[in-house]
């Protein structure tokens, strides 16, 4: 079974995939937002390519656990993504995922300039790995 991780941003959407048996998430691609219908179609194409059976959307909570506008955006997007993919979609707390993604990219020697195109997919991998780790026995 494979799971798709989604880091939903206002400009870009990061995507990652995990094999639940291997329990490791990896960044796959970044979708530049062009409108919800096109965004959903692009995500669905990746989901089909990787034969995912579930998706996890990052829920950007504030540090105190409250929800702001970005969290409401994710909550609204999740059911539409579920309908587009035809697989269950869960929300998962993504606090500090972008910070962790930037840190991982820096550790691999990716320059700040080059991170812009990779940080969203890496953040999706951070979100998805956190979800996998939380489900570990």
From Swiss-Prot:
One of its GO terms (molecular function) is nuclease activity. It comes from Anaeromyxobacter dehalogenans (strain 2CP-C). The lineage of its organism: Bacteria, Pseudomonadati, Myxococcota, Myxococcia, Myxococcales. The keyword Lipid biosynthesis does not apply. Gene3D superfamilies: YqgF/RNase H-like domain (3.30.420.140). CDD domains: YqgF (cd16964). The keyword Amino-acid biosynthesis does not apply. GO terms for biological process: rRNA 5'-end processing. Its main location: cytoplasm. GO terms for cellular component: cytosol. This is Putative pre-16S rRNA nuclease.
């Amino acid at each position: 079974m494979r799971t798709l991780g989604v880091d939903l941003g206002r400009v870009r959407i990061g995507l990652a995939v995990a094999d639940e048996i291997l329990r490791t998430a990896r960044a796959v691609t970044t979708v530049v937002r062009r409108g919800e219908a096109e965004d959903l179609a692009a995500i669905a194409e990746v989901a089909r390519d990787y034969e995912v059976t579930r998706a996890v959307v990052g829920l950007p909570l504030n540090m105190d656990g409250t929800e702001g506008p970005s969290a409401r955006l994710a909550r609204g997007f999740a059911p539409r993504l579920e309908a587009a993919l035809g697989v269950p979609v869960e929300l998962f707390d993504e606090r500090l995922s972008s910070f962790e993604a930037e840190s991982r990219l820096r550790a691999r020697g990716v320059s700040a300039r080059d991170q812009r195109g990779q940080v969203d997919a890496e953040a999706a991998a951070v979100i998805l790995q956190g979800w996998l780790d939380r489900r570990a026995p």
